[in-house]
Amino acid sequence: LASSAASDVYKRQGCGACAKTGEGCFRKDVVNEFVAKAGEADGYIFGSPVHYAAASGALTSFMDRAFYSGGSKMTGKPAAAVVSCRRGGASAAFDQINKYFTINCMPVVGSQYWNQVHGGKAEEVKQDEEGMQTMRTLGNNMAWLLSCIEAGKEKGITFPEREPVIRTNYIR
């Protein structure tokens, strides 16, 4: 469990030092701690409040750096996005977070509705009966998928081998 709210999260500098050293960013924060442990996790749930129809800046900075420097540790592992908003913008933020998973070859875990709850405060979110049911269903679906992956491993079924990535710029 890592929280981008628990400490300052530095934005990505674009210097590439984390990829070169394999030790994360030269700035030590919660992202480095997460990346160091990311390979031990079976699956991931990333959550964010919705700010202006987007995930929070703290989570975006966290995920930018975590996936750039440690994405290979998460490849093939199931992930889910959860968003919380007062009124609107949840589907845009939900989509934004899911893009990190799909570009990293991660199975995306869904629920009976988009993984969102509504309320301005925790007490209000608890009153969102459909949202809370969606969260329970998400938890059950994540547990089921993790069980399926484990059963597959026991039968010798592994994650598909990836081809070397081909990068093409649109302007040459």
Regions found by a protein language model. Name each.
Residues Y10, K20-Q116:
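Helix-loop-strand module that forms the ligand-binding subsite of alpha/beta enzymes
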Residues Q13-C15:
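Short, charged N-terminal beta->alpha structural module
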Residues P107-R172:
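Glycine-rich phosphate/pyrophosphate-binding loop and the adjoining helix
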